[in-house]
Structure formats: structure tokens, C-alpha cells
Amino acid sequence: MSLTLEFLLLLIVLILSHHAHSGSIVKFLPGFEGPLPFELETGYIGIGEEEEVQLFYYFIKSEKNPEEDPLLLWLSGGPGCSSLTGLLFENGPVALKFEVYNGSVPSLVSTTYSWTKMANIIFLDQPVGSGFSYSRTPLVDKISDTGEVKRIYEFLQKWLSKHQQFFSNPFYVGGDSYSGMIVPPLVQEIGKGNYQINLQGYILGNPITDTESEQNYQIPYAHGMALISDELYKSMERICKGNYVKVDSLNTKCYKLIKDYQKCIHKLNKYHILLPDCDITSPDCFLYRYTLITFWANNKSVREALQVNKGSIGKWVQCNYKNISYNYDIKSSVAYHMKNSIDGYRSLIYNGDHDMMVPFLATQAWIRSLNYSITDDWKPWMINDQIAGYTRSYSNKMTFATIKGSGHTAEYKPKETSIMFKRWISAQPL
């Protein structure tokens, strides 16, 4: 065998070896004291024929029994928000310490509510342009809902081919907010495309499902929460006939009533109506954590620890709304829920009851439209003998739950959300 041929064979082996171990184990994170008490892997999966799209992920093994525990793929909303927010704010094993930024790396602390105590979780930055995900070349096609479903499915297939020990684990897809448009069709795509994946179901928090319906339900929600008067609500019902989004241009009375309504709620924090509508750069603001995460993710030592490719992106932003051109080509995901129900997949749909962006009334409405019988009627679910929310189960293996006092995402009530998840994923009653 010639030296040239031997060299080429060696090169091929090295390339294949590199691709087979594209993830990197992270044992230390800037801001966290000592070695991480869990196993974290970060890396990229190339998507497309030339792998021009590089999707970044964080993978955390279950702290209980990773060989047998469920595998969960977690998607954040937006579209365009990094899954790092889910990891550090909602359901991960570490969180940013809430303290005033002093110029150094923001501190990380261990959490007690991590979903990784009972599941392996892949936190995926998607679509391309979110978090640390990027494209090596300009995209030919505009990013879209249906396009992302296919990209994420390709990601999952390639990720599992490099982590084959997780093929047999019960598999779930989860997310919140805008991922309500992506997760149901993704479940359908996985179900029809790859029977090797042990797909069991999906989990959605405050899911955007039908934007027009959700906006219309904000008005009865506002009335129920004493944000508008009985008189205004009844007038809006009568004159606008329940349609507050696509109003007839000749219905001037309805337009006036909507203006009166907007005066009542324009300074409201719709993501959690009990919290102030405040500047996130102020340490007094609950969402000051969004300022801290921006400092943390843009720190050079953090990027090095996470093995982020140098020069791949500029400034990390929590939600990259400005730079992602997006085609919202799925107008409603209700039909996908119906198909997933027919196919027998389990689902947990939960709502923070103080979220006005996706009011629980809207979620209940589309669940009713599936027309499945109730198997376990409306009742409180409890933690330490206290009401944590309310729940109802249906014959299509769907469980609906509210989280009392929570807002648009799990970060508002992480402990309660974690307990709810633990019970559901273990097939126990909430």
C-alpha cells in the first residue's frame, strides 16, 4: 500500500472519528464553584447536504439512571430564543444567581428543581440564528415553521446516531411558548419517519397554538382577572361579537371599545400580570436575569468552556428577533395535536394561570375542540397539602394542568413545574 493511500485512509478515519465524537464534555463552567455535579456535553450537529447549518446543543445526562430514564428534547420559543434560557431559568440543574452585575462573570448556583433529576435532556438552539447556532453560508430558503420541523428531525437522527445508547430510552419532545407551533408537527414527523426512536409523547407549557384565537381569548381573560369592567367586556362581546383581531373596518364602535380596552392593559406585564412591566436592566426587575444571562453568555471564558466555535457568531442575544427572517407558515397546530392523539402519544399541556399572552382559556378551548371525553375531571393537584394548580385528563392520553401563580414560562414557578413533570413522566397522577 502506498504512503499516499495510507495517509488518505488515516485522514478518513480521523474525520469519521471527529464526527462521531463531535460533542465535548464540559466539567467546569465559569461562575460555578468547583466541578459540575452533573454530566454536561455541548456541541454542534451539521444540518443539510453540506452541513452548512450548525445547530448548537447542550446535553445533560439524567442524575438518576441515564441508561433507562427518558430522553427529552427541549425547544425554547420565540421563534429565535436560545435554549440556554430553559437550562438556566426553567428546568436545568444550574441557574444564574440573582445579584447585581459587578463586571465579573455572573455566578451560577445548583438548583433543586432540575428535570435532569429524572430525565436526560437535550437543550437545542433553534432555529439557526438562535443562541450559538449559525450557518456557514447564507441560507437559500427563508426559515419557516415547516422547514424547522425538518431540520430538528434531521438533528435528532444525527444526534442519536452519535449517541446510540439512548435509542431505546423513552423519547419525548418538550418546549414552551412558540414551540407550541413546532413540537406537535415534529412529533408527527418523528412518528412517521423513524420507528427506531422510542417516541412516547410530548410536553408543552403555555403553548402558542392558534395566535388569532389566543389574542381573542385575552379579552375574556382580562375580564375574569378584573382588568376591565363588566360594562366594557359586555359591550365588546355584543358589538365585536367575540372577534377582536380581525375587526370589520366598518365596525367603528368595536374599534373604539378596543382602544378603551388597550388603555386598561397597555402598562401590564402580559407574561405575568402580577409582576411589574419593568426595565430588564434594573436589578429590581424579575427579568433582570435576562441581563445577567447576556453578560454570562458573551463572556470569553464561558464561550471557551462551552466549546463555541470562534468567530461563528457575534454577540449572543437571548432572543434573536431582529436578525432572523421567519416565515410563519403553520397558522394553527391543532390538527397536529389531533393526529398525535390518534397515533396514541401521551401529552402534558400546562399553563401558568397568570399568563395573558397565552391565556389558559385559549388552551382549554382548543383542547375541547379535539372532542375527546374526560377521563378524570377538573380537580386541584397538590404539593405538601397545598393547591399547586388544577388538572383534567382526557381519553386521548392528554393531561391539562394549570400552575397556580405562574406566568408564561416555567421560570416563574420552577419547583411546582418540576414536581408536575416528575409525576407525569413517571405515569403518576398529578
From Swiss-Prot:
Q: Where is the signal peptide?
A: 1-22
Q: Which UniProt keywords apply?
A: Acyltransferase, Disulfide bond, Glycoprotein, Secreted, Signal, Transferase
A Pfam family the protein falls into: Peptidase_S10
Primary location: secreted
**Could you tell me the Gene Ontology terms of the biological process aspect for this record?**
proteolysis
**What GO cellular component is one of the record's annotations?**
extracellular region
Q: Which reaction does it catalyse?
A: 2 1-O-(trans-sinapoyl)-beta-D-glucose = 1,2-di-O-sinapoyl beta-D-glucose + D-glucose
Tissue specificity note: Expression not detected.
Tell me which residues are glycosylated: 102, 299, 323, 371
Compartment list: Secreted
This entry's Enzyme Commission designation comes to 2.3.1.103
Q: What is this protein called?
A: Serine carboxypeptidase-like 13
